[in-house]
Regions:
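Acidic, mature catalytic/reactive cores of soluble proteins
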Residues: 1-126
Length: 126
């Protein structure tokens, strides 16, 4: 029963793009940044689907994460591999995005969450 309720709550966070917000869009959460898609939250959500054997939702989420975020912004990862540590905030792979995988407008911050990128790559490579 608890697992089913948890899955229902997770489904409320699902975006039409297949990505997952940190909280449901209609949750009334006061802190608006939690209404965004975070790489880390999406990966942990996908790992939850894997743990209950929901391969369809797992597959859809993996494709969304790859297509909408990681491949879309891969040039930033490529740049980092070749050039090293970014000099400007905009050069980092950001930790959060809009529901469609685009950047949050006006947010040129470089909050590094390399662990989230590493977690995503680890999970995708399993």
């Amino acid at each position: 029963m608890e697992v089913e309720e948890s899955l229902r709550q997770i489904e409320r966070c699902r975006c039409p793009s297949g990505l997952y917000r940190a909280v449901p869009a209609d949750s009334g959460v006061i802190v608006p940044v939690y209404r965004n898609v975070w790489i880390r939250d999406t990966v942990y959500t996908l790992l939850a689907f894997e743990s209950v054997g929901d391969i369809d939702r797992l597959r859809e989420g993996v494709y969304a994460l790859l297509d909408r975020v990681l491949l879309r912004w891969a040039y930033r990862l490529d740049w980092r591999i070749v050039e090293g540590v970014p000099e400007r905030d905009i050069e980092y792979l950001h930790p959060r995005y809009q529901a469609d995988g685009s950047e949050v407008p006006g947010e040129l911050w470089g909050l590094r969450q390399d662990d989230a990128v590493g977690l995503a790559l680890w999970a995708l490579g399993r």
